[in-house]
């Protein structure tokens, strides 16, 4: 049965207009984005199938074009739509973070980092540079690569903070393997960085570890020096 044959109150677009986007399931939201299904499969059916295949909305929206194209009805057009949605979401979160007082709004920081880093396939490290009011000045990528390649030089982070006239900073990196638990190397690096930053009167406020499902804060774990 096509969506046009559904009762009007159950059609995703009509349901959104009547009840708001929050009332829709992941599959219904995705169906609106897909617009059409395939032969014998409505847009909602296709959305449910894709969500089951990829395991989550985040993994589906972050899939590479080659992987998407393996599924009937998907291809470069869908990849482009998903990339646009991801980037719009990232920019909205960045705007909210820019306007917020970071320490009083840790959930916004966590949401931004999960959206920014959670679906990365390799380890990526970033720095969030803050002013005296703990508002965001800039986000800078520090490194990108495998764990073996992902050596961050402390002096480069110190120089970055000074170049941006930051009063404090937050660092974050993702664990592509899925576990947010800090390693001993993560803990030791954080201690050395905090010590180095203190020499130039810049505070290291927190270190976050990000996965697709969760965000771990060193400060909340009591691991900040």
Swiss-Prot record:
Span of domain MPN: 102-224
InterPro entries: MPN, RadC_JAB, RuvA_2-like, UPF0758, UPF0758_N
Keyword Transcription recorded: no
CDD domains: MPN_DUF2466
Keywords: Hydrolase, Metal-binding, Metalloprotease, Protease, Zinc
Motif mapping: JAMM motif: 173-186
Residue numbers binding Zn(2+): 173, 175, 186
Gene Ontology biological process terms, A to Z: proteolysis
Pfam family for this entry, one: RadC
GO molecular function, one term: metal ion binding
Family named by the database record: Belongs to the UPF0758 family.
Protein name: UPF0758 protein NMB1038
Gene source species: Neisseria meningitidis serogroup B (strain ATCC BAA-335 / MC58)
